[in-house]
A protein has these predicted regions:
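Short beta-to-alpha loop/turn elements within the nucleotide-binding domains of ABC transporters
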Residues: 225, 237, 243
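Membrane-proximal basic amphipathic "stem/tether" segments
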Residues: 1-48, 259, 265, 273-274
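Short coil-to-beta-strand initiation/turn motif
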Residues: 106, 221, 237-239, 255
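Short-chain dehydrogenase/reductase
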Residues: 232-233, 249-251
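Conserved catalytic-core motifs of eukaryotic protein kinase domains, centered on the activation segment
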Residues: 188, 243-244, 261
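Flexible, glycine/small-residue-enriched loop-and-beta-strand segment within the central core
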Residues: 65-225
């Protein structure tokens, strides 16, 4: 019986509109929010200004709150995406011309997107999985790019936290794996000054993480850090510079290369691979 009802909802646009209206709280401007599907439920979207939220086919978007204040802000959720907000505020934007893109096949759970500023962009590429992750942007012209097949699995309050400010970029390559309680910070958020002349000493800077990198528990990547491909960042490491050697383990405070000629795999092997 339930399958027949769902089939009818999918086939008849009027019934779909009634279903969406019953189980969600969307603005009355129908062209501002384009979301439909039997798994679009218990969401609240608040738009103040000229903004747009678009959702593709076969998505499951449930228990989220989107608050967007400003003009020309866009949220694009592509096909076959799951976003479960557990009744939390999933997206908050305040500013103009900000853009969030979540590509097809992503699985997003208990993850927040926070933007206060203008001309910022967050791109989550195909088949990315996030849990207890925070994307936090302040001021203008910042970008976050997460490569395909990357996983970020925080636990409860031990989140994976991205903090960007002052027009910086954070790039994460494809097939990376993040543990929990991790900090990625392109700015110190406050100023350290030369005592004599008042010159600022801690300028914000970009962070780049190569492909197939594994970031361990409680590690921290600070402004100006670059992690090469096929790198393991050990638990508790604090990275503060550009590392140049691939296939290494980086560990310590401050972090340095402690082992070379390594690779890693998501699978836990009980015996040697070769």
């Amino acid at each position: 019986m339930k399958e027949k009802i769902y089939w009818l909802i999918k086939k008849v646009p009027l019934i779909m509109r009634i279903y969406i209206k019953k189980y969600n709280r969307f603005p009355r401007k129908t062209n501002a929010v384009n979301m439909s599907g039997i798994k679009i439920r218990h969401n609240q979207v608040i738009l103040n200004g000229k903004n747009h939220v678009f959702c593709g086919m076969d998505c499951s978007i449930q228990n989220n709150k989107f608050v967007i204040d400003g003009n020309e802000n866009r949220v694009e959720i592509r096909d076959n995406v799951e976003i479960n907000g557990s009744d939390q505020q999933t997206i908050f934007m305040q500013g103009n011309n900000n853009h969030i893109i979540i590509e097809s096949g992503c699985r997003i759970s208990n993850t927040s997107f926070f933007i206060v500023g203008s001309n910022n962009k967050i791109t989550i590429s195909k088949n990315v999985s996030t849990m207890a992750t925070e994307f936090h942007i302040e001021r203008d012209n910042n970008t976050i790019f997460i490569g395909e097949n990357t996983s970020m699995h925080g636990r409860g309050t031990k989140t994976v936290h991205f903090a960007l400010d002052e027009g910086t970029n954070v790039v994460v390559g494809e097939d990376c794996m993040f543990s929990n309680d991790i900090q990625i910070r392109s700015s110190d958020s406050h100023s350290i000054l030369d005592f004599g002349g008042g010159k600022r000493l801690n300028q914000a800077d970009d962070i780049v993480i190569g492909k197939h990198c594994w970031l361990g528990l409680r590690c921290m990547l600070l402004k100006g850090t670059e992690i090469p491909d096929y790198t393991v960042v050990a638990g508790g490491a604090i990275c503060t510079k550009k590392y140049t050697e691939s296939n290494t383990i980086i560990a310590g405070v401050p972090a340095k290369v402690v082992k070379r000629d390594i690779n890693w795999d998501r699978e836990r092997f009980s015996v040697n691979v070769k």
